[in-house]
Structure formats: C-alpha cells, structure tokens
Amino acid sequence: MIVRNIDEIIGTENETKAKTWTSRRMLLRKDKMGFSFHETIIYAGTETHIHYQNHLEAVYCVAGDGEIETIKDGKVYPIKDGTMYALNENDEHYLRGGKEDMRLICVFNPAVVGPETHDEEGVYPLLDDNGKRIK
C-alpha cells in the first residue's frame, strides 16, 4: 500500500514549478500503478499553452476557478470546484487561472517520471526511468 501526505511532497524533487503552475506529483511511474497522480496549482490570472501529445490527462477541480479553451475550435469551458475535464484526444488547449488560484487533481497515462515540464510546444516529453528524453 502507498500512503502519502502532500506535506511530504512540497519542497522535494516531486514538486515541479513553472511560471504559471506548481505540480506536486504524488504517484509516479516508479510506483508502478500505471498512471501518475498530481495536485496542480494554476496561478490566478495566468495562461498556459498545453498540448499533451504523449499523455492522456483527466483533471478534477477541487478549489478556485479558471477556464480551458480548446485551440482547434475555440470553445471555452469554465472551471470551478467540482468540474472535471478529460483530454481524451490529446486536445491542444489554453488553461487559464481565474480570480484565485485553481487547485486541480490530475491523472496522467502513461505515468510521468517526475521532472516533466511543458516544452515550447506545450508538450510533456516521454522520459525513460532515469529522466532522459525518449520522445
């Protein structure tokens, strides 16, 4: 059984930060669950371009507000506490923080290794178990 508290993740190598977000990776590939599980904070008033070409993601908002815009068709969906969205088609999108930080619970398949951040195209690279880029 795996039991972890968020306080054990904050400030460690399993907490990854970028200009517009912080992600606390609670389950990783090394845990061999077949997915990774993250708590991600999207900062208020920010916009992040994301295009997961190598991963599928499901997201559940537990606090805060914001919106997601799909680039292909320009549709905008509000996000608030209780909203779930799934990027089942590797949807390229903008994720925007609203008036307050948005706290999201995220599941990725395949599981991330840990240090992944979005590249210039909004993509998480595929990494091997040592953190080296495969794709």
Q: Where are the regions that the model predicts?
A:
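Conserved short histidine dyad/triad with adjacent acidic residue
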Residues: 37-53
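Short acidic-glycine-tyrosine-enriched beta hairpin
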Residues: 73-89
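Glycine- and acidic-residue-biased ligand/ion/polar-headgroup-sensing regions
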Residues: 54-66
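A short, N-terminal "cap"/entry segment at the start of jelly-roll beta-barrel domains
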Residues: 1-35, 117-135
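Short beta-strand His + acidic residue motifs that chelate non-heme Fe in jelly-roll/DSBH
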Residues: 48-50, 68-69, 87, 92-99
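Short strand-connecting beta-turns/loops that link adjacent beta-strands
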Residues: 31-33, 73, 100-101
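A short hydrophobic beta-strand segment most commonly corresponding to one strand
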Residues: 58, 86, 100-116
